[in-house]
């Protein structure tokens, strides 16, 4: 109740108890009927009945108020449980938030690493795509070259086919010529045989053949022409040699083209190096992005600090709200104390004179109305406080809902990030698969290009060999054709000169032999030159082919080495970049964790210092309040002692005067009141019996209620009202006095916080009873102030356990202690009119049927032992 902002509940109980005790005091302080000369017993009876009715009405009001208090307490306990649950949920949400922040940071680090990896993979893919494009360009270039080479090969094949056709035609001609030569040889043999036969007859025919010499000279001219034809054929051979030299030059040009291709490959390698430089620049850009992410992380840390500051402000506002509630509670208590002090002063003033009793009764009624108004105002304050607490609870619930929604948003964001991570991983896997496919395609293209180059080289070698064989065969055929032509010409000349050259045959034969020798020497020299030229050409072709093959192999090896080196460098740089970025991220994470740990330790130290300062201030305030309270209590005690002394002196004087007046009147009135008194006593005894039965039933119900409300029922703190009332026979002698033994128990310091116990702890009724005894009794019955002591207990503690503020307020009880007296059990004899008459006649301090005494002793007070009553 006190923790949740119901500081006026205790003050509610106090005014009610005050009102009840005031009513009790108003009718218990009334003087006995012997002192009232003008009044009558019937008026007193009516007033007593009215007071009993008022007490019953007040009891019903108290029962309703207690029911309302029970409901409000249940509602308050439910609200406390809700608040505790809300605080627990807030703590859990804070822990979850911290865990989510840690997970978020880990996910952000993973996301950044995956992002960097994805960027690197995209760069590698772009690099591979550029390489693939270059390879495709090279492939197109090689395809164009292959198409040109295939066209050249096709043209060479066509030329070879034409040459083969020509060779076939030449072979056919050679076969036909061979046949003709064989025929000519046969004819020659026949002619030689015939020439040998006719050689004998040449002498006879020399003269005939002189005419043929002219023809032989013509044949010599024809032979010169044949020699010129041979020279022309030699020139043709030289032309063919020049064509072959041109082909060699073409091969040299091809070699130069290959060197140009080598330079282009080197340029591509330079381009790759430039791309590596660009990749390094992109890595620098990635470093800048990492720095930007670090800046964003610092901004998030700042936002977190602002959030913490706002939360601290909210906690400070909550503490100020609690302090205001405490101040309201203290103000209500001070107001109740002031009203209590005013009531005490008014009660002591009312007891001064008989005439002031009526005015005091009216004033008390007015004050009861004021107390009811105060009660209504306090109830309105309580309703306002309840509304404020309900609003704060609604705010806390809305904040909890907001935190839950934020937690749900964070979980959804985390799930989205996980999905994005999965998609990124899938894209990375697909990119890796594409990369592998592209690498396989590149390797297959390289293998195909190598195979095609090897095939082209083999085809070129084959074509060169075929060309060489064809050239050799053509040269051999040409030689054979030349020889055959020469032989045919010689045979023709011989056949033509047969008839003409008979005489000059020997000379001509010698000349012919010399010319044939010369021709043979020339042919031999030409053949040797051709053979040397062929050998040199073959050697040149072989050396150039070997050089070309070596050069191509070296180029391919260099290209492979350059590509491998570029790949290795790229992989090494990539690993270095990844490792450096990982190291940077780890360093940043470590720095951030260290910073957060330091900030947390600083915040904890600051909070501890603030708590210590607050505790010191609180202890100093408590000490100052205690000192002020003790000084006020001392002042009040001094005032109260003075007032008591004055009231005692006045009461003694009044009693002396009244006793002398009452002695004369009492004897006259006793006779008249005997019969009425007996009837009234019987009625009152019957009513007392009924009320005792009712009280026993109510006690049983109250005990059952206590058992239902708590497992450990509190100790009975009720005042036993079952007193044995007796009118002793010693009253006839006038020496006995009726001593009232009021036993007051001091309240324990550790009282339960239930409002029912607090309602019983109000000591106003006890003070009123003591005042009644002072007014009704003699000087001897006035309590000694030495035997009384006032004890006040008021403590206010603030305990902080793990940041939570728990507040305990011990009850403040003001009790009057009296010397303990043993309870004496007396047997109540039956009342008889004679005993009553004797008792009233003999004693100077007459004790007739005083309604105030009856109420004080509990004979007509049905609520003396009731825990919900006013005492």
From Swiss-Prot:
* Disordered: annotated span: 1-40, 708-741, 778-871
Q: Tell me the keywords, alphabetical order.
A: Cell cycle, Cell division, Coiled coil, Meiosis, Nucleus
Q: What is this protein called?
A: Synaptonemal complex protein 1
Give the GO cellular component terms, alphabetically: nucleus; synaptonemal complex
Q: In which compartments does the protein localize?
A: Nucleus
The UniProt regions of compositional bias labelled Basic and acidic residues, in chain numbering, are: 729-741
Role this protein plays: Required for chromosome synapsis and normal fidelity of crossing over.
Highest taxon in the source lineage = Eukaryota
Coiled-coil regions listed in the entry: 58-304, 331-608
Q: Which GO terms describe its biological process?
A: cell division; homologous chromosome pairing at meiosis; reciprocal meiotic recombination
Write out the biased-composition intervals (Polar residues). Answer: 18-40, 719-728, 831-847
């Amino acid at each position: 109740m006190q923790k949740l902002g119901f500081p006026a509940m205790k003050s509610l109980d106090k005014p009610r108890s005050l009102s009840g005790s005031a009513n009790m005091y108003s009718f218990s302080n009334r003087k006995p009927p012997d002192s009232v000369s003008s009044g009558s017993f019937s008026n007193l009876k009516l007033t007593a009945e009215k007071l009993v009715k008022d007490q019953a009405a007040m009891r019903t009001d108290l029962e309703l108020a207690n029911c309302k208090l029970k409901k409000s307490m249940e509602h308050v306990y439910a609200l406390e449980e809700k608040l505790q649950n809300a605080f627990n949920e807030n703590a859990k949400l804070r822990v979850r938030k911290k865990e989510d922040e840690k997970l978020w940071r880990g996910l952000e680090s993973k996301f950044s690493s995956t992002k960097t990896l994805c960027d690197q993979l995209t760069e590698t893919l772009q690099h591979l795509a550029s390489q693939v494009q270059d390879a495709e360009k090279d492939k197109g270039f090689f395809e164009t070259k292959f198409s040109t080479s295939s066209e050249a090969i096709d043209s060479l094949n066509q030329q070879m086919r034409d040459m083969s056709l020509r060779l076939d035609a030449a072979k056919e001609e050679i076969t036909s010529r061979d046949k003709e030569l064989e025929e000519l040889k046969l004819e020659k043999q026949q002619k030689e045989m015939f020439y040998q036969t006719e050689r004998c007859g040449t002498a006879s025919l020399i003269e005939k053949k002189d005419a043929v010499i002219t023809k032989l000279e013509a044949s010599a001219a024809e032979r010169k022409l044949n020699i010129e034809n041979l020279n022309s054929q030699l020139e043709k051979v030289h032309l063919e040699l020049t064509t072959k030299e041109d082909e060699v030059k073409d091969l040299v040009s091809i070699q130069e083209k290959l060197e140009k291709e080598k330079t282009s490959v080197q340029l591509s390698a330079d381009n790759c190096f430039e791309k590596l430089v660009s990749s390094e620049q992109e890595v620098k850009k990635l470093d800048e992005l990492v720095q930007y992410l670090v800046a964003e992380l610092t901004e998030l840390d700042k936002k977190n600090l602002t959030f913490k500051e706002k939360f601290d402000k909210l906690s400070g506002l909550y503490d100020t709200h609690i302090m205001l509630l405490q101040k309201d509670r203290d103000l209500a208590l001070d107001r109740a104390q002031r009203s209590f002090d005013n009531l005490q002063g008014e009660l002591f003033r009312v007891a001064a004179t008989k005439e002031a009793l009526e005015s005091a009764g009216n004033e008390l009624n007015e004050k009861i109305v004021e107390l009811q108004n105060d009660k209504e105002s306090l109830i309105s304050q309580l309703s306002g406080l309840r509304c404020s607490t309900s609003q704060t609870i609604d705010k806390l619930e809305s904040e909890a809902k907001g935190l839950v929604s934020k937690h749900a948003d964070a979980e959804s964001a985390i799930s989205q990030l996980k999905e994005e991570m999965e998609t990124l991983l899938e894209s990375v896997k697909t990119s890796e698969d594409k990369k592998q496919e592209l690498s396989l395609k590149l390797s297959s293209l390289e293998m195909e290009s190598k195979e095609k180059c090897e095939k082209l080289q083999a085809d070129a070698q084959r074509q060169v060999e075929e060309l060489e064989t064809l050239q050799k065969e053509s040269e051999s055929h040409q030689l054979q054709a030349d020889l055959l032509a020469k032989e045919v010409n010689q045979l023709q000349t011989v056949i033509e000169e047969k008839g003409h050259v008979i005489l000059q045959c020997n000379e001509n034969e010698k000349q012919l032999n010399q010319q044939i020798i010369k021709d043979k020497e020339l042919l031999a020299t030409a053949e040797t030159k051709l053979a040397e030229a062929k050998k040199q050409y073959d050697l040149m072709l072989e050396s150039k082919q070997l050089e070309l093959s070596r050069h191509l192999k070296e180029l391919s090896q260099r290209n492979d080495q350059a590509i491998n080196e570029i790949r290795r460098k790229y992989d090494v740089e990539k690993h270095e970049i990844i490792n450096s970025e990982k190291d940077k991220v780890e360093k940043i994470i470590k720095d951030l964790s260290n910073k957060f740990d330091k900030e947390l330790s600083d915040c904890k130290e600051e909070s501890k210092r603030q708590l210590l300062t607050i505790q010191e201030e609180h202890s100093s305030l408590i000490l100052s309040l205690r000192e002020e309270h003790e000084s006020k209590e001392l002042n009040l005690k001094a005032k109260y002692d003075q007032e008591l002394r004055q009231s005692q002196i006045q009461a003694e004087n009044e009693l002396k005067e009244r006793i002398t007046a009452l002695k004369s009147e009492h004897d006259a009135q006793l006779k008249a009141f005997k019969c009425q008194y007996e009837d009234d006593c019987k009625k009152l005894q019957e009513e007392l019996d009924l009320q005792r039965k009712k009280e026993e039933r109510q006690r049983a119900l109250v005990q059952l209620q206590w058992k239902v409300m708590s497992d450990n029922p509190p100790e009975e703190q009720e005042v036993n009202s079952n007193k044995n009332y007796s009118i002793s026979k010693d009253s006839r002698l006038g020496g006995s006095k009726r001593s009232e033994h009021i036993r007051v128990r001091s309240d324990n310091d550790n009282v339960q916080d239930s409002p029912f116990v607090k309602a019983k702890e109000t000591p106003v009724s006890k003070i009123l009873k003591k005042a009644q005894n002072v007014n009704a009794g003699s000087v001897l019955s006035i309590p000694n102030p030495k035997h009384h002591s006032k004890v006040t207990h008021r403590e206010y503690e603030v305990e902080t356990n793990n940041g939570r503020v728990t507040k305990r307020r011990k009850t403040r009880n003001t009790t009057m202690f009296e010397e303990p007296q043993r309870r004496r059990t007396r047997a109540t004899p039956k009342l008889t009119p004679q005993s009553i008459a004797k008792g009233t006649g003999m004693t100077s301090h007459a004790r007739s049927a005083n309604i105030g005494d009856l109420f004080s002793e509990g004979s007509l007070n049905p609520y003396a032992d009731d825990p919900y009553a006013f005492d």
